[in-house]
Amino acid sequence: MDFTLSEEQQLIQSAAREFAQNEVAPIAAQFDASGEFPFETIRKAGELGFMGVEVPTEFGGAGLDAISYVLVMEEIAAADAAHSTIVSVNNSLYCAGILAYGSDEQRKRFVTPVASGQAIAAYGLTEPQSGSDAANMRTRAVLAPDGSHYVINGKKSWITSGPVADFMVLFAMTQPEKKSHGVTAFLIDCNQPGFIRGKSEPKLGIRASATCEIEFQDYRCPVENRMGAEGQGFSIAMSVLDSGRIGIAAQAVGIARAAYEASLQYARERRAFGSPIGSFQMIQQKLADMKCRLDAAHLLTMRAAWNKNQAKAKGLRNTLEGSVAKLFASETAMFCAHAAVQIHAGMGYSKELPVERYFRDAKITEIYEGTSEIQRMVIARQETGLR
């Protein structure tokens, strides 16, 4: 396992860092305050290949590997977590699933505009009453008598990019009696009748990534837009989340890195009792703990990405390594963001600096795409072979 970056990986890392620092960082506070969706910078991200890093060039993407995706996510997240959330959904949850389970025609129609940044995608799994509990999913898809389309009714909640999405991967129950084995995946055109965007969520962090509830009212989905076979949806969703968790781990590493770098600079410049506060042992201990956890989180995330590349070549899943990276990196982001606020003291509580935003943004990494509690359960089950 060699983490020496290839020339190609170094180039995309450099491009992502330049984009993040020059285009994203200067507007992050403004869009966090307003809660507006950053259409312009997301379009630019698409032009640079960041909205479809692992998508083949024939479908509008950059045609790179999982490590390249991790590098892009980390750089963008270090500038603004909200931007990286949008990038993550497009790459990990949407494009990855269609590339793995969709037909060539579905890839051309639904992946190409998203990977190129011309369209925005969403992922519809979570529901108001059951969260991501697929066995109790209430959204129903009923095949019409003539077999030409499905009629979909139900609600999805906490849909990232829902207010602005053009396309969605949706999971709905086609055979309720089979519980999780009765879930089917569909590709949804969000601009068709019966797709209703509900209330936007007033979130603690990642505020520029629009989030809302979606309702389906007699939405007609052509049968050719079903992805995979009937009843295959749950396995598709879990496989996609394996990949998505690596992206969230990279996002968490980016947030942690931003918090650490801000703390380093402040510790050097802020003076108290005649000395830089970085010379005080209590501050040094915090910085040392941040550095150790940050490096460990980064390496676990790189390992998960490397393993994903190997697993993909062999047609295997990458469940364990993705969950380990996501769990540790997300808790590292919270640890580093909390320490950064403490190091900055009163200024860490002020919106004049981005440190308080890092703190607010970090929390979601412990929640979405499987909470820390779920990750611990996944890891233990993978290791013991027990359920």
Report the location of each language-model feature.
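Alpha-helical interface subdomain recognition
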Residues: 1-83, 89, 101-106, 113, ...
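Short Ser/Thr-interspersed hydrophobic loop/turn segments at strand-loop and sheet-helix junctions
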Residues: 49, 73-77, 172, 188-193, ...
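Short Gly/Pro-enriched turn/cap motifs at secondary-structure boundaries
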Residues: 114, 129-132, 158-161, 175-177, ...
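A short, Trp-centered hydrophobic/proline-enriched beta-strand micro-motif
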Residues: 117-125
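Hydrophobic, small-residue-rich alpha-helical packing segments that form membrane-like cores
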Residues: 130-133, 148-150
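Flexible, small-/acidic-enriched active-site or ligand-binding loops
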Residues: 136, 191-222
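A structural signal for short hydrophobic beta-strand segments in well-ordered beta-sheet cores
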Residues: 139-143
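A short core secondary-structure module
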Residues: 148-197
